Amino acid sequence: MPKMKTNRGAAKRFKKTGSGRFKCKHNHLRHILTKKSSKRKRQLGPKFFVSAADHKRVVACLPYA
């Protein structure tokens, strides 16, 4: 049986933690930032964890994570 392929786009976006959860960065924080409030940009700053609803999909994309 051939090796499973890792989804390279997902590999660049998600990192697995020691507890098995996946962390990633918020979107909407790359450009066109002048119209966004300081509060909104600050809240988008820290990393967040993938929800339980999406966890199965991320695991399927990253078989060796």
Swiss-Prot record:
One of its GO terms (biological process) is translation. Keywords: Ribonucleoprotein, Ribosomal protein. It comes from Aeromonas hydrophila subsp. hydrophila (strain ATCC 7966 / DSM 30187 / BCRC 13018 / CCUG 14551 / JCM 1027 / KCTC 2358 / NCIMB 9240 / NCTC 8049). GO terms for cellular component: cytosolic large ribosomal subunit. GO terms for molecular function: structural constituent of ribosome. The gene is rpmI. NCBIfam families: rpmI_bact (TIGR00001). The keyword Ribosomal protein applies. SUPFAM superfamilies: L35p-like. Belongs to the bacterial ribosomal protein bL35 family. InterPro entries: Ribosomal_bL35, Ribosomal_bL35-like, Ribosomal_bL35_CS, Ribosomal_bL35_sf. Pfam families: Ribosomal_L35p (PF01632). This is Large ribosomal subunit protein bL35.
